[in-house]
Amino acid sequence: MSAHWTFKTKELEDQVENQRRIDQELKKKVLKLEFCLRETRIQTRKLQKMGERNDMAIQEVLNEQLAAKKQHEADLSSNQNLWDKSGFKIIVSMSMLILVAFSRR
């Protein structure tokens, strides 16, 4: 009977040792996974910052292009409005009046 209990004890000790080994291996794997997760988060933050910087740069370029377009449109409208200005109309009217007056003489 004593041999039976000795065998059972040895068997249980072997199982405990196997469980310890498995536990240590799992702990190592968990540590590796935690490290990988940490590195992934760091890389994700870096990529987010790069994306934000790129978005800001694109926004600045778009704002500059919009401002240039508005300035160009304003320049065009000021040139087109030359015909609508009252001073220009007066000068043209006076010039035509003078031309008509000289052409009748």
Curated annotation (Swiss-Prot):
Keywords: Membrane, Transmembrane, Transmembrane helix. The chain crosses the membrane at residues 82-99. The keyword Transmembrane applies. InterPro entries: NEAP1-4. It is a single-pass membrane protein. A motif (Bipartite nuclear localization signal) lies at residues 8-29. GO terms for cellular component: membrane. The keyword GTP-binding does not apply. It is found in: Membrane. Its main location: membrane. This is Putative nuclear envelope-associated protein 4. The lineage of its organism: Eukaryota, Viridiplantae, Streptophyta, Embryophyta, Tracheophyta.
